[in-house]
Amino acid sequence: MERVAVLFRRTCNSENCSKGRRPLRERPLAGLFFCSLPAPLSIPCLSLPGSNPGDFVPKVKTNYICNSCGYQSAKPLGRCPNCQAWNSFEEEVPTASTSGKSGRGGLGGYGGVKGGKLTPLSTVGRREEPRTPSGIPELDRVLGGGLVAGGVTLIGGEPGIGKSTLLLQVADKVASRGGTVLYVAGEESLEQIRLRADRLGVAADLQMTRDTRAEHIAALLEEHKPALCIVDSIQTVTVEGEGAPGGVAQVRDGTAMLTRAAKETGTATVLVGHVTKDGTVAGPKVMEHIVDTTVFLETVGAFRLLRSVKNRFGQAGELGVFEMRGEGLIAVDNPSAAFLAERPLDVPGSVVAATVDGQRPMLLEVQALASKTPYPNARRVVVGLDPRRVDVVLAVLERRLDLTLGGLDVYVNLAGGLKVPDPGLDLAVALAVYSAVVGRALPQNVAVFGEVGLAGEVRSTQMALRRAEEAGRAGYKRLVVPPGLDGQAGVKSVEEAVKAVWR
């Protein structure tokens, strides 16, 4: 038996070998192996890792992606280490198209040409993005002036809250002015949409399709170049070779493909997104980074609030107020009057407060009720406000105004169903609780705002001038506000505020 040093590669023409490997001396560095077989015999096949990677079939690597924030892991995790979400990981098997043109390439919401070309900032022209008015003033307010050509807007909200109704009204307004509207119906039949359109009084002719393949939608945008494209919903859009519809990869890559098509064709595009049980848009968080604008539609009492949380073409935090009626979502032009319409007069514990929700000033009613407690420990119930701030205000009233609250249950409510974490409501809470305890109602023409500190001082708040202007438009002549506001004397402490109200 002789030891033979043999250089191998992966092809073989031996009669006894079905793997296709044969000795090859003229290939250097392919791998040196010592065989103890007799030289005339066929050399057995050996697996040579790394000698020729093209001969191997690569092992499919499975990733797990958090459907909340897009965090990737090699194994499923119970809790995402990035966003702390529980049971949010979904399996994703990379396909051939994942690294291709429909994959992660160009995920950002930009419309530039790919490549290595550099452009100096000084040579870039200055121009405003053209806007298309939606025909609904409250929606235009939230979007910053209207729909931007080539901009992509993501609208989220609970099922049945009115997303499709609002967008069908917008489509009617745009089409009635001569613009072409493409409506992609992924969840409803065309007959169902026709019935809703008849109920809403939609008279314009819309171009509709039920084809939810992202490649085909992009082709329609390129062919027709509509003024507005509505996709209802993004969770029904599919991309070839990217897994099941509604999955992380489908939603991510479908959004990226439609965004690129919208930028290239200059089409204002609106994507409808489902929400999870905690109120966030279903799908990977990267989807919200791709789009230009993200707005949410939520229910507050009898009203619908449209709130922007991201806007590349305007100011985020804008708020629009709507009311659902038989003819659709109707814009509420004066939210302050709407929220104060049912306010009782001459009742202790009721105060009109000037607040700011997002970027919009409005007047709301702060209510307080104090009653003797039958329990050893008095209760504190807060609705619509920050409970910790209310506890601070109650402590200030006890310490600085000698108001006894230890044996009283105190209830504080922000009427209307809104939840506003505004420090400027502190003074309204203080006066409402004081009014409820002493049993004296505030005058009808008084509105207040201001932050209360631990020393009992009244501090200034953001957007004080806009708050005062909103109160003036509503007819409130007396303002109890912090010092420093033009035309107003201002109060420096809670004690001064009490004296100013009941002077």
Swiss-Prot record:
GO MF annotations in UniProt: ATP binding; ATP hydrolysis activity; ATP-dependent DNA damage sensor activity; damaged DNA binding; zinc ion binding
Which SUPFAM superfamilies does the entry mention? P-loop containing nucleoside triphosphate hydrolases, Ribosomal protein S5 domain 2-like
Domain notes from UniProt: Has a putative N-terminal zinc-finger, a middle region with homology to RecA with ATPase motifs including the RadA KNRFG motif, while the C-terminus is homologous to Lon protease. Absence of the zinc-finger domain gives a slight increase in sensitivity to gamma and UV irradiation, absence of the Lon protease domain gives slightly increased resistance to gamma and UV irradiation.
According to its UniProt entry, the protein's GO biological process terms are: recombinational repair
Q: Where is this motif: RadA KNRFG motif?
A: 310-314
Q: What happens when the gene is disrupted?
A: Moderately decreased resistance to gamma and UV irradiation, no effect on H(2)O(2) resistance. Slightly reduced DNA synthesis rate even in the absence of ionizing radiation (IR); after IR chromosome fragment assembly is delayed. Double recA-radA deletion mutants have lower rates of DNA synthesis than the recA deletion alone with or without IR.
* Similarity remark: Belongs to the RecA family. RadA subfamily.
Q: Which keywords belong to this entry?
A: ATP-binding, DNA damage, DNA repair, DNA-binding, Hydrolase, Metal-binding, Nucleotide-binding, Stress response, Zinc, Zinc-finger
Give positions of region: Lon-protease-like: 409-503
What this chain does, per the entry, is described as:
DNA-dependent ATPase involved in processing of recombination intermediates, plays a role in repairing DNA breaks. Stimulates the branch migration of RecA-mediated strand transfer reactions, allowing the 3' invading strand to extend heteroduplex DNA faster. Binds ssDNA in the presence of ADP but not other nucleotides, has ATPase activity that is stimulated by ssDNA and various branched DNA structures, but inhibited by SSB. Does not have RecA's homology-searching function. Plays a role in DNA damage repair. Following severe irradiation (IR, 7 kGy of gamma irradiation), genomic DNA is fragmented and progressively degraded for the first 1.5 hours after IR, in a step promoted by RecA and counterbalanced by DNA Pol I and Pol III. This is followed by massive DNA synthesis and genome reassembly in the next hour. Optimal priming of DNA synthesis requires both RecA and RadA. Pol III initiates DNA synthesis while both Pol I and Pol III are required for its continuation.
Gene name of the encoded protein: radA
Which principal EC class is assigned to this enzyme? hydrolase
Q: Does the keyword DNA repair apply?
A: yes
- Zinc finger C4-type: from-to: 66-83
Q: Where does ATP bind?
A: G157, E158, P159, G160, I161, G162, K163, S164
- What name does this protein carry? DNA repair protein RadA
Region Disordered, as annotated, extends over: 118-138
The answer to whether the entry has keyword Nucleotidyltransferase is no
Q: What's its EC? A: 3.6.4.-
